[in-house]
């Protein structure tokens, strides 16, 4: 006969399998079916709490632990304390475990001692008591970084450009991924050619360190391109050997701090420190907040002398869906470490980060994107046929207004549909072209149909022929709520199309106001009347010109060429921060 313990063990294995298969809802349903709360022994309730916690049903698990603790179940105290500690609630765990019965306290003394050590250390470093409910993993991360506040980075190469690694989360199809790939390719070419960048001879290969390149998640969009250019690529997710051993850390205090970090920091340290030590990097440039959280402390432990933190969009305190409580203490601590500074691709983002983190402007540098003029030749006959069919349906149109964006909330696609409807009221001889795909595309098309303008809008979908579609437009419009530095505004001008944009991110830095485009008043609520007025002006401006004006051409050449981007990047990272 199968015992209760054996049944519970089998259920635990099944739940683990379902979790690995990402079938969490199915796992929860199974747990509730097999272990109905009203008929549980103490052992079964304890195991149910464990299983629920393991499938991310944290609140329900904690409620069960508290029910058992109310019944003076010391094993529940221990299990609850252990899980609280591992999630960063060391003070909560300490309070719970201190209350175990005197008769069994010895059983849990080692674990309580471990909790007491980290709490005592953190309170000493903070100079104050830490209240219950505080995430102690974040405090430990902060002080692990501050351990290096008096470090003396080794001297950087003089007269040559040393060994560089560029790090980010993936090589998907995003703008940051395009820029980091382009940068790696250009430096790799100079290395093969034994050339110079900004007067510095490139004597070392460049490496891309990427968290994950899973094809099924489309995280490898630029991988083929960088490999063809002989860029070395390391995928962190595939590192299985030569992992970090904290026994190599001499300071007992630092070792204790490293034992109580946020999981993503632990992951970066475990997988990357040995590799970074082996590579003996001179410079490390880490792009995007999530990668900075994973890699920055690992780089300090490995002794990388020059660390640059790449900020590609507005801070997570503005883009709430990207917010993590680790970011603010992470960046504020890193800002005081010698050899570390911040880099962005526009001044708007640096101002927002500086205001949020209460840091001086000297901590930030700007490297504008390097943008290649888009090809206006289609990659196949398909775009041309689509365009011909659309022009046949809209033969009365003498003006084409368009946009290129993902159909997601941040890009505000419904404002685009509303603009088209408003503009058509006074300019019926207008057609519209929208390039891009996303979760809200079908809803945007439905909105256009409801407004009676679906026949006037060509929804191209995702396309590699962006240049072809841009050169069909008389005016380009971007209604984004949030941006970093939108390359598409630059690309539109490169093919001679004037632009209108919200002031999202660095959009206003992409063109000359009143010459090659206009900025709207507000990024969150689009002023459609203002957008219509600007569109009228630019349509007339476009008709009076033949191509891009010299002033705009010079502006784009001086700010957004790939050569300028690479040169500025090397200049910023090849010297120690001020």
Curated annotation (Swiss-Prot):
Q: Which pathway is this protein engaged in?
A: Glycan metabolism; Vi-antigen biosynthesis; Capsule biogenesis; capsule polysaccharide biosynthesis
Question: Which InterPro entries does the protein's record reference?
Answer: Glyco_trans_1
Listed under GO biological process in this entry are: capsule polysaccharide biosynthetic process; carbohydrate derivative metabolic process
| SUPFAM superfamilies for the chain | UDP-Glycosyltransferase/glycogen phosphorylase
Q: What superkingdom does the record give?
A: Bacteria
- Recorded GO MF terms: glycosyltransferase activity
Please give the NCBIfam families that the UniProt record associates with this protein: PRK15490.1
Name this polypeptide is given: Vi polysaccharide biosynthesis protein VipC/TviE
Source species of the chain: Salmonella typhi
Q: Which gene encodes it?
A: vipC
């Amino acid at each position: 006969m199968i015992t209760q313990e054996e049944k519970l063990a089998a259920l635990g294995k099944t739940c683990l399998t379902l979790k690995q298969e990402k079938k969490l809802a199915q796992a929860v349903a199974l747990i509730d079916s097999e272990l109905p709360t009203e008929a549980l022994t103490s052992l079964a309730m304890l195991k149910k709490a464990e299983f629920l916690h393991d499938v991310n049903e944290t609140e329900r698990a904690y409620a069960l632990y508290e029910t058992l603790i109310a019944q003076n179940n010391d094993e529940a105290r221990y299990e609850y304390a252990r899980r609280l500690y591992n999630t960063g609630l060391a003070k909560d765990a300490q309070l719970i475990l201190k209350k175990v019965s005197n008769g069994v306290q010895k059983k849990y003394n080692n674990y309580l001692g471990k909790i007491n050590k980290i709490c005592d250390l953190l309170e000493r470093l903070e100079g104050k008591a830490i209240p219950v409910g505080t995430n102690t993993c974040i405090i430990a991360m902060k002080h692990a970084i501050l351990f290096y506040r008096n470090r003396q980075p080794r001297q950087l190469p003089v007269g040559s450009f040393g060994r560089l690694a560029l790090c980010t989360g993936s090589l998907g199809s995003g703008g940051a991924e395009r820029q980091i790939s382009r940068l790696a390719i250009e430096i790799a070419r100079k290395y093969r050619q034994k050339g110079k960048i900004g007067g510095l001879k490139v004597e070392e290969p460049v490496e891309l360190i990427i968290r994950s390149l899973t094809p099924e998640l489309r995280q490898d969009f630029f991988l083929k391109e960088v490999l063809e250019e002989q860029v070395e690529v390391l995928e962190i997710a595939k590192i299985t050997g030569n992992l970090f051993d904290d026994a190599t850390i001499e300071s007992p205090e630092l070792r204790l701090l490293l034992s109580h970090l946020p999981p993503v920091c632990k992951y970066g340290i475990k997988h990357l420190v040995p590799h970074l030590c082996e590579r003996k990097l001179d410079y490390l440039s880490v792009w995007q907040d999530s990668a900075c959280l994973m890699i920055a402390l690992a780089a300090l432990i490995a002794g990388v002398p020059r660390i640059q933190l790449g900020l590609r969009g507005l801070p997570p305190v503005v883009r709430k869906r990207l917010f993590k409580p680790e970011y603010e203490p992470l960046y504020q601590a890193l800002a005081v470490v010698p050899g570390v500074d911040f880099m962005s691709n526009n001044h708007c983002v640096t101002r927002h980060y500086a205001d949020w983190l209460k840091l001086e402007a000297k901590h930030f540098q700007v490297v504008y994107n390097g943008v290649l003029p888009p090809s206006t030749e289609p990659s196949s006959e398909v775009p041309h046929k689509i365009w011909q069919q659309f022009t046949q349906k809209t033969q009365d149109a003498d003006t084409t207004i368009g946009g290129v964006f993902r159909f997601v909330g941040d890009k505000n696609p419904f404002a685009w549909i509303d603009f088209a409807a408003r503009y058509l009221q006074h300019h019926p001889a207008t057609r519209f072209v929208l390039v891009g795909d996303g979760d809200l595309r079908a809803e945007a098309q439905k909105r256009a149909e409801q407004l009676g303008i679906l026949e006037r809008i060509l929804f191209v979908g995702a396309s590699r022929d962006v240049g072809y579609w841009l050169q069909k437009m008389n005016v380009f419009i971007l209604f984004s709520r949030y941006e970093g530095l939108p390359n598409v505004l630059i690309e539109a001008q490169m093919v001679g199309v004037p632009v209108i944009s919200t002031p999202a991110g660095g959009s206003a830095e992409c063109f000359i106001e009143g010459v090659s485009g206009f900025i709207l008043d507000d990024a969150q609520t689009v002023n459609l009347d203002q957008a219509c007025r600007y569109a009228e002006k630019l349509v007339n401006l476009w008709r009076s010109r033949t191509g891009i004006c010299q002033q705009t051409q010079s502006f784009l050449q001086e700010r957004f060429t790939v050569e300028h981007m690479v040169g500025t990047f090397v200049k910023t990272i090849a010297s120690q921060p001020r």
